[in-house]
Each structure stands twice: as C-alpha cells, then as structure tokens.
C-alpha cells in the first residue's frame, strides 16, 4: 500500500524521512502536523527528536525544555534532552537526567546501558561499575556483573557505607554465579 495523504500517513512519512536522515523534510512534515494538532505531545516529541538527531542541539534543548515545563518528567522528552546533552558532551548533565529516569525505570536495560556509558564518559567510574553491573545482571550476564561489582568495591575502598552496600550486592549476586560443577 502506498503512503496516502491522511495525517497518519504523513506522520509515518516523517518517521521514514527521519530514518533516511532527511531531517529537513521530516521537520517540514511534522511541523505541518503540529500546526494542525498544536496540543499533540507525540508530534511535538517527534519534532524534538528530529532536532536532536539532526544535530541541531540548541534548538532541540530549547524546544524540549519548553515541553518538559508542560509535561514534567515525560520519559521520551527527558531521554531526548539527555541525548542532546550527550551530543554536546555534557555528560554530567546527561547523567543527572538519566539518573532521574532510572528512579522510575530501575530495570530498563537500555537506560542502564546508556547511563553506564555516560557515567564512564563523565569519569564517574564508581557509578559506571555499579550501573553497568545492574545492566549486566538484568541481561543475565552474572559473572560479568560480579566483576563490575568487585571493581566498584575496590574503587569505593575509602567509603565504608558504599562498600557495605556493594558487598551485600556481591553476596547476593554470588548466589547466581555457582561453580560449574555444582550446577549439574
């Protein structure tokens, strides 16, 4: 079936143009839809995402922040703002936003992967190893998760409270990682 002239078809066409990296065409289409549906948050979020993906970071951040004033804590908008900060290499700002999102989505493995990457880039190695261990755990990679927790414990050697929490996690995780001979 060919793409027609319905609004749904136009929106789909805008997404296709975005995937093809034809950002100008994509913005034209979704902007026309925004004019027709000025209160549609999905269309507005798509515009913000196109700005980010096209590298128009300043416009993306301004537009996204205005939308977040209306829809505080909106997941796709918050993630988009974090991505804009990542493009600017402002990893600390991106980390703060992703940490806020993590509070509401603690087992979202894509979020955990992105957050650990941002923490590594911001040189927050303790945060990186803790978050990466969560990502690995929820991905079923228990031995790798255990190694990350052990590295986090090493980094936190002077913070006894954090070491205690990490040690508890290690003990729990060790129940998932059994010697191969005892698994049979």
Model regions and ranges:
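Extracytoplasmic and endomembrane cell-envelope/extracellular-matrix remodeling and assembly machinery
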Residues: 1-66, 97, 141, 151, ...
């Amino acid at each position: 079936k060919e793409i027609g002239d319905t609004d749904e078809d136009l929106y789909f066409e805008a997404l296709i143009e975005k995937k093809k990296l034809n950002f100008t065409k994509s913005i034209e289409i979704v902007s026309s839809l925004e004019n027709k549906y000025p209160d549609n948050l999905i269309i507005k979020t798509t515009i913000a995402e196109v700005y980010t993906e096209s590298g128009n970071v300043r416009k993306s951040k301004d537009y996204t922040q205005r939308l977040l004033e209306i829809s505080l804590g909106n997941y796709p908008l918050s993630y988009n703002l974090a991505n804009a900060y990542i493009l600017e290499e402002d990893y600390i700002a991106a980390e703060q936003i992703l940490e806020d999102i993590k509070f509401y989505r603690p087992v979202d493995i894509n979020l955990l992967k992105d957050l650990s990457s941002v923490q590594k880039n911001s040189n927050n190695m303790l945060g990186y190893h803790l978050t990466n261990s969560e990502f690995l755990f929820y991905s079923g990679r228990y031995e790798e998760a255990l190694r990350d927790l052990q590295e986090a414990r090493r980094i936190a050697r002077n913070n006894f409270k954090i070491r205690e929490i990490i040690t508890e996690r290690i003990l729990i995780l060790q129940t998932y990682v059994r010697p191969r001979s005892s698994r049979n």
